[in-house]
Regions:
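Basic nucleic-acid-binding interfaces
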Residues: 1-20, 28-61
Length: 61
């Protein structure tokens, strides 16, 4: 999945970009107060996307 598509999905689920590090962006789900680190690569593997969505307690795209 492309990073741009994942970010769009996270925003639609109500998540916000919390802070940025070297190669990762930390996303926050304000309703559950859960956070997850999202790598800034062009392509993100489906297993990684699944883990991010699971940590943030949102549906998978």
């Amino acid at each position: 999945m492309k990073l741009r598509d994942l970010e769009r999905h996270l925003r639609r689920q109500g998540c916000v970009s919390f802070r940025e590090g070297g190669a990762h962006t930390v996303w926050l789900n304000p309703s559950t107060r859960k956070i997850s680190s999202v790598p800034r690569h062009r392509e993100i593997k489906e297993g990684t996307v699944h883990g991010i969505c699971k940590q943030l307690e949102i549906t998978r795209p």
